[in-house]
Amino acid sequence: MIQMAGLMSADEIFERARNAAAAATGPDEKAMKIDYPALKEKIRAALGERKVALCHINKFLPEGYEDQGRFNLVLLTAGNVVFDMVIGDSYFRYDVVSVSQLDKVQLIDAMWDNREKRREEPFLSVRLMHGEEAHLLLALDDEERSSLLAFARAVSAARNPER
């Protein structure tokens, strides 16, 4: 979900990450073992004094992230810098890229085969690409979709402003 009402601090992003960690644990899974004070300091160190304009939390890890963590946050700062933070039981990493360095912004609106529910369901993804890297934002429900579209609009406007 993306938060747009005002700018967020590193501590506010930490609170969102902590809430997402609780939500990322299914009823048949063991709870995540995160050192929350250490995570708070890592997020503070990563963001410094930067203010975050948009925050999207992927409830389900995109393909390619599975071995690294349980969920990720994609942030857009007020200065148009993207942070992709992956958080797991004893894992934290982040990538940083300026919106101006993105080679391509790709939005995919399609259907996926939900084998658990035995039906096709809609999904929306935004792929932020630079070099060999791609940062993915996923939306599987209507609330996430509208938030994800807001993120895509903000990145597109910053990357390709109308003149």
What are these regions (language model features)?
Residues 2-75:
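Anionic N-terminal interaction surfaces
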Residues 143-163:
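Pleckstrin homology
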Residues 43, 47, 106-109, 155-159:
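Hydrophobic, Leu/Ile/Phe/Ala-enriched alpha-helical segments that form helix-helix packing faces
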Residues 16, 20-21, 116, 120-122, ...:
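N-terminal non-globular leader segments, chiefly Sec-dependent signal peptides
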Residues 126-149:
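Canonical phosphoinositide-binding patch of PH/PH-like domains
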Residues 62-123:
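Phosphoinositide-binding peripheral membrane targeting modules
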